[in-house]
UniProtKB/Swiss-Prot annotation:
The gene is hisE. One of its GO terms (molecular function) is phosphoribosyl-ATP diphosphatase activity. GO terms for cellular component: cytoplasm. Belongs to the PRA-PH family. Pathway: Amino-acid biosynthesis; L-histidine biosynthesis; L-histidine from 5-phospho-alpha-D-ribose 1-diphosphate: step 2/9. It comes from Azorhizobium caulinodans (strain ATCC 43989 / DSM 5975 / JCM 20966 / LMG 6465 / NBRC 14845 / NCIMB 13405 / ORS 571). This is Phosphoribosyl-ATP pyrophosphatase. It catalyses: 1-(5-phospho-beta-D-ribosyl)-ATP + H2O = 1-(5-phospho-beta-D-ribosyl)-5'-AMP + diphosphate + H(+). It holds the Pfam family PRA-PH.
Length: 109
């Protein structure tokens, strides 16, 4: 991790480290202690805020809300025990075919 850039892999490591901290000192730990439903709720809120910022004209707001969204996604993935490499593998699988083929191949629920 460089001082001016944090990758998603860095964020995954930061969340994992902060998950081990005391809840009084770590927002990440306190969020995880509230359970998966709260983590999912926060992710949803940040997704909406990002979408709303995107329809506005303030690029800085989009950047800020996207950072919040990515953080809350990293927390949710950690809470579910999903590693970023697993998401990368799924993205690789999907990019081996066209978007229409990939969508058609998903199981309907």
């Amino acid at each position: 991790m460089s001082e001016d850039r944090v990758t998603l892999a860095d964020l995954e490591r930061i969340v994992a480290a902060r998950a081990q901290a005391d809840a009084g000192a770590s927002y990440t730990r306190s969020l995880l202690d509230k359970g998966i439903s709260k983590c999912a709720q926060k992710l949803g809120e940040e997704a909406v805020e990002t979408a709303l910022a995107a329809v506005g004209s303030d690029k800085a707001a989009v950047i800020s809300e996207t950072a919040d969204l990515l953080y809350h996604l990293a927390v949710l993935l950690h809470a579910k025990g999903v590693e970023l490499d697993e998401v990368h593998a799924e993205l690789a699988r999907r990019t081996r075919q066209s978007g229409h083929e990939e969508k058609a191949s998903r199981q309907r629920s």
